[in-house]
A protein has these predicted regions:
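Residue-level detector of well-ordered alpha-helical segments, enriched
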Residues: 87-92, 164, 168, 189, ...
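Short alpha-helix boundary/capping elements
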Residues: 42, 100, 176-180, 268
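Catalytic DNA-binding helix-loop module of base-excision-repair DNA glycosylases/AP lyases
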Residues: 148-199
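C-terminal accessory module of base-excision DNA glycosylases/AP lyases that mediates lesion recognition
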Residues: 2-75, 80-81, 185-273
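Helix-hairpin-helix/helix-loop-helix acidic hairpins
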Residues: 70, 75-76, 80, 85-164
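Aromatic-enriched hydrophobic runs in primary sequence
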Residues: 75, 92, 98-127, 168-172, ...
Length: 273
């Protein structure tokens, strides 16, 4: 199946799928342009580089509130944990940095950031064991996978019920794998990408799907218990991740998972044209 792409000679104009002028193609040119845009984004630019926290910032003292200080980049904390004896402190710093940059709202759970850090620390008490956990391929039925452990339901603040942090779990593992050079790479589960992915599946894989194929839908959970709700999220992410993997294979890996994520996210958020 051939994919028709409308290409522009202008390096600052995206290539698009023919007949879909709002759907950027998954090309090397588009990836290079979007990655340049990412590096101009004040939030993400700081996080993808080694940027230490503000003077006086301590992740253990500023778990839920930075007090107006910069909490440090996730790249900083992951690199530091390979050389600093205070592994737990660096792990907590990384949790806070990923949560802050991606607005995944761990603090909507009771003691969310600290609790999630403790969950990771329990199964990966040092950087070597963390890399080992990151190297495990994701399987939605593996209850000991790091994504599964992190995304278990936690008590939500101010209301009855649990909150599942699947977006944070996948993003933490993706950031950690990149920074620590793990062999396995995780996709980041994202609302914007999950909205657009069915259309990319149709174009690149010739697999038509309903618009909500890769969405976590509240109405489907009405009769589920807490364990089933957690498994449902893992299953949706498993399909989402597998779709991305097959699309990348289809285009001969001319871009990677992060670049696909960025092309879709920035284009569909309206930040680039």
């Amino acid at each position: 199946m051939s994919i028709s792409i409308v290409k522009s000679d202008n390096p600052y104009v995206l290539d698009y799928i023919e007949g879909k002028d709002t759907m950027p193609a998954l090309t090397r040119k588009n990836a290079d342009f979007i990655e340049a845009v990412v590096r101009l984004d004040s939030n993400y630019a700081k996080d993808i580089l080694y940027n230490p926290p503000s003077d006086g910032y301590d992740p253990e003292m500023n778990v839920s509130d930075s007090g107006g200080k910069f909490c440090g980049s996730s790249e900083y904390w992951f690199k530091e944990m390979m050389k600093e004896p205070e592994y737990y402190r660096c792990l907590l710093g990384a949790v806070i940095a990923v949560d802050t940059t991606n607005s995944t709202h761990l603090e909507a759970c009771l003691n969310g950031r600290k609790t999630v850090c403790d969950i990771i620390y329990k199964c990966a008490p040092n950087v070597e064991s963390l890399i080992d956990k990151l190297n495990e391929p994701f399987n939605p039925n593996n209850k000991n996978h790091l994504i599964s452990l992190i995304s278990k339901g936690l008590p939500a603040k101010g209301k009855v019920g649990l909150r599942y942090n699947i977006s944070f779990a996948t993003k933490f593992c993706a950031y950690a794998a990149n920074s620590l050079d793990a062999s396995e790479r995780s996709s980041k589960y994202d609302d914007v990408v999950s909205d657009a992915l069915p259309e990319y599946s149709k174009v690149y894989l010739n697999e038509p799907h309903r618009k909500s194929q890769y969405k976590i839908m509240q109405h489907r959970q009405k009769k589920m218990n807490e364990l089933e709700k957690h498994q449902y999220r893992l299953d949706v992410f498993g399909e989402y991740s597998d779709c991305i993997k097959r699309i990348l294979k289809k285009i001969d890996y001319v871009i990677n998972r992060d670049e696909l994520d960025h092309i879709i996210w920035y284009a569909y958020k309206g930040d680039v044209k």
